[in-house]
Amino acid sequence: MSNLLEKFKNKSKSLFFIPFFVSGFPSFDFLEVFLLKNKDKIDILELGVPFSDPVADGPVLQEINYRAMVRGVNLNSTLDWLVRSGVSRNIDVILLLYFNLIQNKLEENLKRFKDTEIKGLVIPDLPMEEAETLIPLFNKYNLDLILFISPTTRDERMKKILKMAPSFLYCISVKGVTGERDKLPEEGVSFISRIKKETDKPLVWGFGLSNSSQIAALKGLVDGVIVGSAIGKRLLNNEDIQEYFDELYRATL
């Protein structure tokens, strides 16, 4: 059993809280202070490595990716910072990155991720067929490859993903790109209700969450929630996010 599956199996709260931040935004110093201050509230940290064409992201995260890249944030600086700051030593971190950032020296990169104490990878542009062949290599370095499912995933493909997924399932519960939504989409709720009957693997709701009432409504349906764009929007506006972050966290208890 993978480290993350074991973590979900032993969870003692209603939902795992999985905040998403883009590496280096608004600065490495801010992230280090904020994340370590709140490490006991963060069950898993999803950290995005800035990329020039983040196809799954809405306008907020696209802008944040751009600003981080302009400042020179990349995969190497992200890994160096994780080690230097102690963030990956104190918090379970999964990286979101695009495959062409690592494919040329794949095994060398996976070893470095392991040495950095990364727990898993989310790779939006990785075809399922390639993911299937890579899972043994990821397992060699004790890294979870986290797979996506969505309401548009075909039944045959869904069965294959549910069977081969080595970790929790990242449920894209709305159509389109990342971003805040005012309410939970009925399609997403019914989709996850159906999937829940077909697998015992943990399900995590991604995309569209922005407030505590949405999170509270997901208790009993999913095992964890990811909040990214709503946090990023407040950071873009130079807002103090602590009170908002605490509100989201309390909703997962």
Swiss-Prot record:
GO terms for molecular function: tryptophan synthase activity. The keyword Amino-acid biosynthesis applies. Its EC number is 4.2.1.20. Keywords: Amino-acid biosynthesis, Aromatic amino acid biosynthesis, Lyase, Tryptophan biosynthesis. PANTHER family: TRYPTOPHAN SYNTHASE ALPHA CHAIN, CHLOROPLASTIC (PTHR43406:SF1), TRYPTOPHAN SYNTHASE, ALPHA CHAIN (PTHR43406). The alpha subunit is responsible for the aldol cleavage of indoleglycerol phosphate to indole and glyceraldehyde 3-phosphate. This is Tryptophan synthase alpha chain.
